[in-house]
Structure formats: structure tokens, C-alpha cells
């Protein structure tokens, strides 16, 4: 084999090895986005990494969407991943990155939404829960007022404070408060 061809081949092999190695290393060093949930109605728990750096895991997103299904009907809707990013950032901002988030309400079908409205629960007609863009939560050991204030400071969507019911609503719609 001529020297030029051999040296070009060796250079190519080294280049490929370096590229593969750096791609693998880059992925493995990306920060994992992890969420831990406890659903207050289904009594199910979920501990899941749904994102590495800027790459979402489609299987993990599907598992979380199923977990946050309408507990009255069993219907599942694909959640807006910005909700998960908001929850992740909220746990970091309250200084509890490994906190288990109590889910009071996730996705709601139109039927469940109307059921709650007709029973005087103060539910919005066009609730973002029906678009899988909202979630009602609390974090054990963190006051709901602190959770509310922290969510408001993030300016990432709507924040509703339900002190009497001990939960906070967060969504990824327009920034507003109630």
C-alpha cells in the first residue's frame, strides 16, 4: 500500500474514532432533567429522567403524559414538555432538586372539567388542564405560598394559589396570576 494512502487511511480512522468518542462524551456529560411525582388520586409514584441537556426522551415524555392522565376517565393527552421543564426549574429554585412533587390534578378531559365546574370547584371553562399545559401541585415540606412566590418569579406562565386546598396551579400559558 502506498505511504500516502496508508497515512490518509490512518488519519481517517483516528478522526472517526475521535468524533465518535467526543459525541459519546458530550451526551454523557449533559445534565439529566429528573422529576419525581406522587399522584394524590391514583397513589402512583413516578421517578423519571425525561431530558438530557436539550434532548427530550420521547418514551419518558409518553410515560409522564400517561401518569398525568385524567384520573376520572383514564384518558391520556400528550403533555407540553414545557410543563416538565417548569416543574424541574421550580424544584431547583426552591432548593429541592430531588423533591417529590404531589400531583393534585394533571390532564382533564372536557367531561371532567365540566363535572368539576358543575360541582362548584371554580374551574375555568377553557382550562389549560384540558390541553395538557397545566398541573396542580404541592411539594411536601415547602409552603404553598413559597411555591407560589417562586413560580411567579420564574415568569413562565399562569400561577394560581389555592391556600385553602393546599395546592398551586402552574401552567405554560400566558403569564398571569390569581
Sequence positions of predicted segments:
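Charged, often glycine-rich, active-site loop that binds/positions anionic groups
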Residues: 111-125
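Boundary at the C-terminal end of the N-terminal hydrophobic targeting segment
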Residues: 22-28
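Catalytic cores and adjacent binding grooves of peptidoglycan-active enzymes
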Residues: 33-38, 122-178
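Loop/turn elements at helix/coil->beta-strand transitions in domains of secreted/extracellular proteins
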Residues: 44, 96-101, 155-158, 166
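N-terminal targeting signals for Sec/Tat export/insertion, comprising classic cleavable signal peptides
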Residues: 38-56
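Active-site acidic/histidine clusters and adjacent loop/turn architecture
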Residues: 52-104
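Bacterial N-terminal signal peptides
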Residues: 8-19
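N-terminal secretory signal peptides that target proteins for export/translocation
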Residues: 1-4
Amino acid at each position: 500500500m502506498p505511504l500516502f494512502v496508508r497515512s490518509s487511511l490512518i488519519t481517517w480512522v483516528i478522526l472517526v474514532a475521535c468524533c465518535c468518542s467526543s459525541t459519546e462524551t458530550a451526551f454523557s456529560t449533559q445534565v439529566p432533567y429528573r422529576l419525581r411525582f406522587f399522584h394524590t388520586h391514583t397513589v402512583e409514584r413516578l421517578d423519571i429522567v425525561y431530558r438530557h441537556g436539550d434532548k427530550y426522551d420521547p418514551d419518558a415524555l409518553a410515560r409522564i403524559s400517561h401518569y398525568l392522565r385524567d384520573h376520572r376517565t383514564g384518558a391520556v393527552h400528550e403533555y407540553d414538555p414545557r410543563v416538565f421543564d417548569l416543574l424541574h426549574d421550580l424544584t431547583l429554585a426552591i432548593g429541592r432538586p430531588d423533591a417529590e412533587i404531589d400531583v393534585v390534578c394533571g390532564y382533564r378531559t372536557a367531561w371532567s372539567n365540566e363535572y368539576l365546574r358543575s360541582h362548584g370547584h371554580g374551574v375555568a371553562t377553557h382550562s389549560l388542564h384540558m390541553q395538557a399545559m397545566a398541573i396542580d401541585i404541592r411539594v411536601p415540606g415547602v409552603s404553598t405560598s413559597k411555591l407560589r412566590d417562586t413560580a411567579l418569579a420564574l415568569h413562565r406562565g399562569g400561577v394560581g394559589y389555592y391556600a385553602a386546598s393546599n395546592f398551586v396551579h402552574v401552567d405554560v400559558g400566558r403569564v398571569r396570576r390569581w
